[in-house]
């Protein structure tokens, strides 16, 4: 898949991600319906509806490429697939349920087992990010594209984002010391990767334990 094709797909998804974000916020406002999945993690009608919106659009854009989603896949690894979409309709479901502002809506296109395109929407923060190549990563601000490759952190302090569960674990603190981290901030969801891309943070440190849609 050539660069222009990836760009066209990414741009075609932006309005869908905005719509999905609005739906997620509206469903939360009305009151979410919650269940506990077999892996003991929560899922809401917001997760299901956002998943439906994304998979419907993506299936239209690339009907030949299979989709792996947190809300429709088993916990088995999909090691035999070379080309596929990864969807995490709502990353940070606990934040979403508890009216916190860190949940995100996510999709990535994997070609030859490597990510080549991604879109992330943080609806509460009104931040929308997308990328279709290493030097083509953007945030939409006031309907204008900001190329994140040009964004630099304004201070020299090394700042890291950590997940809530890893905050004070000895191996994480050891890495902080090794990298001479000046400050860290607890953060949920894929928002961690977005703020690094935007030049606001430097590192994300976590234990190597994740499903496909968490990476």
Across the structure, where does each feature detected by a protein language model lie?
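Generic detector of well-ordered alpha-helical packing
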Residues: 48, 71, 89-92, 123, ...
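Short secondary-structure junctions
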Residues: 32-35, 137-139, 179-185
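Residue-level signal for inorganic ion chemistry
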Residues: 24, 47, 58, 93, ...
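N-terminal subdomain of lithium-sensitive/metallo-dependent phosphomonoesterases centered on the IMPase/IPPase/PAP
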Residues: 1-90, 174
